[in-house]
A protein has these predicted regions:
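A residue-level signal for conserved active-site and pocket-lining positions in enzyme catalytic cores
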Residues: 1, 72, 164, 249, ...
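DNA replication initiation on ssDNA origins
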Residues: 1-69, 77-87, 158-161, 166-169
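Short amphipathic beta-strand starts and helix->beta connectors
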Residues: 50-58, 90-98, 231-237
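Short beta-strand
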Residues: 58-62, 98-105, 141-145, 154
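Catalytic residues for metal-mediated phosphoryl-transfer on nucleic acids/nucleotides
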Residues: 72, 89-90, 94-97, 169-171, ...
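Structured, beta-strand-rich domain cores
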Residues: 73-129
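Modules that initiate DNA replication and primer synthesis
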Residues: 77, 107-123, 160, 168-173, ...
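Aromatic- and Lys/Arg-enriched surface recognition patch
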Residues: 124-174
Length: 277
C-alpha cells in the first residue's frame, strides 16, 4: 500500500474527521474539511489510515517533480445520477491498466500506477490522453495537479493531495471496484494494483495504441482536426449535438476559411436527428 501511494514525503494531507461536515444538496456530495499535516509522512500514518484513526492524502508530485502514481478524479455534476458502470465498461473496452476506487464523496478516483517514477508533467499528459477513451471532459481533475513544488514561507511543500482509498479498510466506503462493479478487499486491491503497474515505455505504447483505436474509423474530414470530432464522427450523434457543433464551427472556420458556413450546413450528416440551423 505504501509502495503504491508513494509521493511527496515531506508533507501529507488529512481530513479533519471530527469537524462539521457540509453536504452539497445540489450535487449530493459530502464536503469535509482538509488540512496539511506539515510533517513528513511515516509508515505509521499509512497504517493509521487503514485502521480508521486518521484519513490521509498524498501529493503524487515529489519535491523532485516526479510521480509514480496519478489519478483521474471523477467528480460528477450530480452524484445521485453518476453512472459508474459505464466508466468501468470503457476501462475494460480499451484494456486500460487503471484501478478505479470509490471516493470519499461518492465519485470515482481512477488510479494509474507505474513501476518507476516519471516526470509529473509526463504523468499529467498521459492521464489527459486517457480522458478521451473514458468519455470524460477535458476539465476533469487530474493528479498530480502540480509539476513542481515550491516551499511556502514556512518551508513546507504542499500543492494538492489526493485522499487515499481504504480508510478504515474493514468498513471502508472507499474501495476499489472490479470490472463488474464489485467491491474489492484491501488485499485484493493491492494485488491487482501491483499487477496493473506499467513501465514508462509501456505507458508510451499504451497512449499510442489507445489514440489509434479511438480515431480509427472516423470521418476523413477530421484527419487534421481535433480527436474529439474524429471520434464522434464514427457513429451518428444523438446527445451532445450543441457541443459538437460548437467545436465543428471552430474547426470549419480554420479549415475552410470563406466556405465554412456551407460546411456547417452540411454537418447535419453526423447527427441521428438534424440540428436546427
Amino acid at each position: 500500500f505504501i509502495k503504491l501511494f508513494s509521493g511527496l514525503k515531506e508533507n501529507f494531507g488529512q481530513i479533519k474527521l471530527h469537524a462539521k461536515v457540509e453536504f452539497d444538496k445540489e450535487r449530493n456530495k459530502i464536503k469535509p474539511e482538509y488540512i496539511w499535516s506539515k510533517q513528513p509522512i511515516q509508515p505509521t500514518h499509512y497504517q493509521q489510515h487503514l485502521e480508521g484513526k486518521i484519513s490521509i492524502g498524498i501529493q503524487p508530485c515529489t519535491k523532485d517533480g516526479k510521480a509514480s502514481f496519478g489519478c483521474i478524479d471523477v467528480d460528477p455534476e450530480n452524484y445521485k445520477d453518476f453512472n459508474i458502470v459505464l466508466l468501468l465498461s470503457y476501462i475494460e473496452k480499451y484494456k486500460l491498466p487503471l484501478v478505479p476506487c470509490r471516493s470519499k464523496s461518492g465519485g470515482l478516483h481512477i488510479y494509474l500506477f507505474l513501476t518507476e517514477a516519471i516526470s509529473a508533467q509526463t504523468m499529467r499528459d498521459a492521464l489527459a490522453s486517457i480522458l478521451l477513451p473514458l468519455e470524460l471532459k477535458r476539465t476533469t481533475e487530474i493528479y498530480p495537479k502540480q509539476i513542481e513544488l515550491e516551499p511556502d514561507e514556512h518551508g513546507n511543500m504542499s500543492g494538492n493531495f489526493i485522499n487515499l482509498p481504504y480508510f478504515n479498510h474493514t468498513k471502508t466506503k472507499r474501495y476499489a471496484l472490479d470490472k463488474n462493479n464489485t467491491a474489492l478487499s484491501l488485499e485484493q486491491f493491492i494485488k491487482i494494483a501491483l499487477a496493473s503497474r506499467v513501465s514508462p515505455n509501456e505507458l508510451d505504447q499504451l497512449i499510442t495504441r489507445v489514440d489509434t483505436e479511438i480515431l480509427m474509423g472516423g470521418d476523413p474530414e477530421f484527419e487534421d482536426g481535433p480527436p474529439c470530432l474524429q471520434r464522434l464522427s464514427k457513429t451518428k450523434i444523438g446527445d451532445g449535438r450543441d457541443r459538437f457543433m460548437f467545436n465543428y464551427m471552430v474547426f470549419a472556420k480554420k479549415k475552410y476559411k470563406e466556405n465554412w458556413p456551407d460546411k456547417v450546413n452540411e454537418a447535419n450528416k453526423y447527427f441521428s436527428v438534424p440540428w436546427p440551423l
